[in-house]
């Protein structure tokens, strides 16, 4: 059975660090998930826009990694819009260094997930519920989450220092 692909959207150094952390961590918690991230999953020499567009058309789950630095980036809005047009897709904003009140439309339309333990666990349960026959039982999912959470927490903490630009002014 093919793995369920999750598109990880990012823009900027900190957002990239968050997406990289999720890409590494997600398959440890839900083994039937295959995260897709442009930085790692587009072959050298490939037409990157064609590859990204193809992925955006074929995935059912996407995580948009938002930080104070990339809230107003057009690329984030493009990817979120493309993901949301797919029938039965789920688009989750993952807020690193942000509160839900910091996010404005159109991204505010998606129920945001704070990059903390409680909210990340809820996100994992949501992703698991979308796996159509491949989902883990709740007890097993919770055990995997608890086992691997510290790794993600460390990587998210390290990502806090990964921003090379000032946040955009509103």
Task: Tell me the role of every PLM-derived stretch.
Residues 2, 68-86:
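Conserved TIR/SEFIR loop-to-helix hotspot centered on a Trp-containing motif
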Residues 35, 90-92, 112-114:
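Conserved beta-strand scaffold positions in the cores of enzyme catalytic domains, especially
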Residues 28, 81-91, 96, 102-103:
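Arginine/glycine-rich "motif VI" loop of SF2 helicases in the C-terminal RecA-like domain
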Residues 41, 68-69, 94-100:
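Short beta-alpha junction loops
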Residues 1-27, 97-170:
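C-terminal interaction surface of TIR/SEFIR-family domains
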Residues 62-63, 112:
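Short, well-ordered beta-strand core segments
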Residues 44, 73, 78-80, 105, ...:
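Generic structural "secondary-structure junction" signal
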